[in-house]
């Protein structure tokens, strides 16, 4: 019998560990317009010149991310895997996604490679891994950026006990225009493109995170009717089955 593919996705956005269902991962048929890193972050952003792996801040205050404890690293938030942003899955069949995107515009070379695999071991236990590699070359000389990002996770959701665990890492580097070598050149007769600039400015950032949450729930059983489709004597018929679900009354 063919098992239908169903994928559930959620996050633990707060340390109170209340699960929050989110949109399914980007696919060719679903949410593909959100696959761009900057557009996924905000529809209106300010960057430092590179299309990918550049310090970024949303012009829309409500869209800004403050998931990193260090205020000086908030500009890297969209590229970092934090425990609050970690996605957890539950699938009826193993799910994998491999994508490669490349920008062919002259002077703005971009490479974006992503990989995701997740699957269940039984109904309650799920394991998965996700990795991303970004590489971009900016319009000006000596501007470039790289990002290596990944995470591994596991979740167990039983009738009474649940567990979520994850480990994420992000490592990025960005070479940018470091500004004018001498600000007094602004008063000179040089054209803007001829002003001497610092071309060796570099930013490197590494972020590691680990997360583990255990929860136990006192539940109440409730029966409900579920209709299933079966074939009898060459005919398709529907039969009702009685199933039991557990309604949480109190969690610890």
Question: Across the structure, where does each feature detected by a protein language model lie?
Answer:
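Outer-membrane beta-barrel translocator/channel fold
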Residues: 44-47, 139-149, 153-210
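Short strand-turn segments of transmembrane beta-barrel domains in outer membranes
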Residues: 69-72, 82-88, 92-116, 138-139
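Extracytoplasmic loops and strand-loop junctions of Gram-negative outer membrane beta-barrel proteins
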Residues: 79-80, 98-99, 134-136, 191-200
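Residues on the lipid-exposed face of transmembrane beta-strands in outer-membrane beta-barrel proteins
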Residues: 98, 115-119, 152-158, 212-218
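Transmembrane beta-barrel strands of outer-membrane/channel proteins
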Residues: 98-102, 131-133, 165-171, 250-252
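Structural signature of outer-membrane beta-barrel domains
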Residues: 103-105, 134-136, 170-175, 217-223
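Surface-exposed extracellular loop regions of Gram-negative outer-membrane beta-barrel proteins
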Residues: 111-151
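Repeated loop/turn-to-beta-strand initiation elements of outer-membrane beta-barrel proteins
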Residues: 124-127, 160-165, 221-224
């Amino acid at each position: 019998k063919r098992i239908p593919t169903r994928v559930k996705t959620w996050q633990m956005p707060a340390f109170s560990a209340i699960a929050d269902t989110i949109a399914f991962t980007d696919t060719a048929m679903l949410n593909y317009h959100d696959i761009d890193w900057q557009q996924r972050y905000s529809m209106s952003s300010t960057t430092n010149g590179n299309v990918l792996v550049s310090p970024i801040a949303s012009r829309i205050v409500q869209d800004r991310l403050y998931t990193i404890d260090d205020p000086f690293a908030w500009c890297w938030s969209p590229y970092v895997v934090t425990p609050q942003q970690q996605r957890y899955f539950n699938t009826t069949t193993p799910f994998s996604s491999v994508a490669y995107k490349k920008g062919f515009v002259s002077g703005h070379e971009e490479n974006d490679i992503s990989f995701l695999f997740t699957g269940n071991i039984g109904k309650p236990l799920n394991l998965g891994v996700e990795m991303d590699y970004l590489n971009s070359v900016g319009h000006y000389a000596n501007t470039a950026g790289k990002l290596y990002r990944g995470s591994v996770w596991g979740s167990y959701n039983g009738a009474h006990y649940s567990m979520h665990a994850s480990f994420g890492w992000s490592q990025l580097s960005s070479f940018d225009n470091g500004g004018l070598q001498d600000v007094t050149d602004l008063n000179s007769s040089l054209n803007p493109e001829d002003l001497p600039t610092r071309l060796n400015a570099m930013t490197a950032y590494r972020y590691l995170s680990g997360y583990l949450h255990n929860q136990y729930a006192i539940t109440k059983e409730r029966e409900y009717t579920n209709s299933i489709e079966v074939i009898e004597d060459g005919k398709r018929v529907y039969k009702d089955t009685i199933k039991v679900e557990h309604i949480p009354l109190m969690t610890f």
